[in-house]
Design a protein with these regions (language model features):
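Substrate/ligand-engaging "lid" and interaction regions
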Residues: 1-42, 46-537
């Protein structure tokens, strides 16, 4: 059983092994898509294959769509060359259900895959052709939050971006430069309308994409390298829109135990590929069943009825409320709390942590008691039900190979949003008192303890990558387990850093509690477990 056109001709073998197959004539759909593309997606990674591609497959199966997707990869061209093309753009989606069953689907909704490579004339010309098509309604993106960043740490354009600004839209090298070049092709083809839709997991994602594209339009026009009407085109929402979205589906990297299941079924050539850019890709993707995609309904060239596939279309204000609900209260803070303490207590699976009564109570209190009183209710999703699903279905799912180490990545960049917003809301509400927050400060103290790089048994571990790791770790570098130290003096410089926490913890008076907790957490080996048990009892 090979995952390609030839291998899938043997439908009976696949179906007998329990795989759901595409229920449409792929050749016909591919021909229609090539002629009249309606949706191109940038970022051929796991979330796209597990979510957007599968939604389109469902709609093709039901006859609600007659065309499929085009996907372009601009960060790592080897994904297209080594994964998409050998498998004729098929992939296997393994849905990991909380009850222990797995659902296996061969997803065939991607009809064409291209490298977003301006040095490859054939592929870049084809992308320009797609972008010039009247039929194209939307370009969507999962390129990670940093994919939209054009600036270096000194605030000036990164070298590739600066070079593109000076050279114009012909052969840009930077990711967004290449996308802006394609949009310029659409402009030149008659200022055709399009929705440019970021589906990355960051708040106000549409604004991030808009700012990046607009910077190129302004730069090229200013330098006399593009028609001056291009800038107005990009800035006119009736022509080019940048809707906000909220996406939520946990898609860990392809797991070896899932690979074994597929091998036993008789699927061949499943070996994952690690590209020269260190991207880890496999012909299959594993993901949780739960998924949410809420989209601001602003599509100047129309859109397909994706609500039939479970996507929610609404106003920008509602997208913002859903995003805040998830990121500031109902999911992300709980994930970070488990990530920090999971690493300290030696866990390798987030799901296993929910069997620890102290950790379970920690996230229940942070979610229901500390977070819910200030949650923003978006109306289209109920915050309490959302937390119920997170704590009872999603996080405890034993078949989700998600790790605290993965989630602990970049924690310094996440604390301000995931906890700082709740603290600000408490500080602003006359009926609430910041002093009533007891376990959010325990997470802060836990992160400072984590920065020591020593687990609760006294063994060294390597903290996950984080741009502030060296700086933040330096504040606790002299703290040793079981040795006396002045917590307030040691931690004051970092606790007053509002960039990290979203607020100045010293000014709010929360520093005392964080310091007290930190002193207890560093009392010796076993102190982390003991402190958690004490404050969650």
């Amino acid at each position: 059983m090979k995952l390609n056109n030839n291998g899938l001709e043997n439908k009976n073998a696949w179906e007998a092994a329990g795989y759901a197959l595409p229920q449409y004539d792929r050749e016909t759909v591919a021909a229609r898509t090539k002629q009249n593309p309606f949706w191109i997606h940038f970022g051929a990674g796991n979330i796209f294959r597990a979510f957007q591609a599968n939604v389109v497959q469902d709609l093709l199966n039901k006859g609600d769509l007659d065309r499929g997707l085009v996907v372009a990869e601009g960060y790592d061209y080897e994904i297209i060359e080594k994964m998409n093309h050998p498998h004729d753009d098929y992939s296997i989606l393994v849905t990991l259900k909380a009850n222990g069953t797995v659902e296996k689907t061969v997803v065939g909704s991607v009809m064409e895959s291209l490298a977003l490579d301006s040095e490859d004339d054939a592929q870049f010309s084809r992308l320009k052709e797609i972008f010039s098509a009247d039929s194209l309604q939307m370009a969507t993106f999962t390129i990670t939050e940093k994919g939209y960043n054009l600036y270096g740490s000194d605030g000036s354009f990164m070298p590739a971006v600066a070079a593109d600004m000076a050279a114009g839209p012909q052969k840009p090298a930077s990711y967004i430069g290449k996308v802006a070049s394609l949009l310029y092709a659409r402009f030149l083809a008659g200022e055709k309308p399009i929705a440019m839709v970021s589906m990355d997991n960051c708040s106000h994602n549409g604004d991030k994409l808009a700012a990046a594209i607009t910077a190129f339009a302004e730069g090229w026009v200013k330098n006399g390298l593009a028609d001056e009407a291009f800038e107005a085109y990009v800035k006119t929402s009736g022509k080019v829109s940048f809707p906000w979205t909220m996406i939520d589906k946990i898609t860990p990297r392809p797991d070896a135990s899932i690979e074994e299941i597929l091998k036993k079924d008789g699927v061949e050539e499943l070996d994952p590929v690690v590209t020269s850019k260190n991207t880890y890709v496999a012909p299959f993707v594993n993901a949780e069943e739960c998924q949410y995609l809420v989209i601001e309904d602003n599509f100047p060239n129309g859109r397909p009825a994706l609500e039939k596939g479970g996507l929610i279309f609404t106003t920008r204000e509602t997208v913002d409320k859903v995003e805040k609900m998830k990121v500031c209260t109902c999911l992300n803070p709980l994930h970070t709390a488990l990530a920090v303490y999971g690493c300290l207590l030696g866990y390798n699976l987030i799901s296993e942590e929910m069997k620890n009564p102290s950790l379970k109570k920690l996230v229940e209190v942070i979610g229901y008691k500390e977070g819910l009183p200030v949650v923003i209710n978006p109306g289209i999703l109920d915050p309490k039900e959302f937390i119920d699903t997170v704590l009872n279905v999603r996080i405890p799912n034993p078949f989700m190979p998600d790790t605290p180490q993965r989630i602990a990545t970049d924690t310094s960049q996440k604390l301000a949003i995931r906890f700082g917003e709740t603290i600000k809301a408490y500080a602003a509400a006359p009926s609430l008192n910041v002093a009533d927050l007891k376990l959010i400060p325990l997470v802060f103290a836990g992160w400072l303890r984590y920065l020591m790089g020593v687990d609760d048994n006294g063994n060294a571990f390597t903290p996950s990558p984080d741009p502030m790791l060296a700086e933040a770790s330096s504040y606790v570098a002299d703290v040793k387990l079981g040795e006396a130290f002045d917590a307030k003096k040691t931690l004051a410089p970092i606790l007053s850093n509002a960039k990290i926490w979203g607020v100045d913890l010293c000014a709010l008076g929360m520093d005392t509690l964080v310091c007290d907790y930190f002193t207890e957490l560093t009392a010796g080996t076993g102190a982390v477990a003991a402190t958690l048990a004490k404050y969650t009892a």
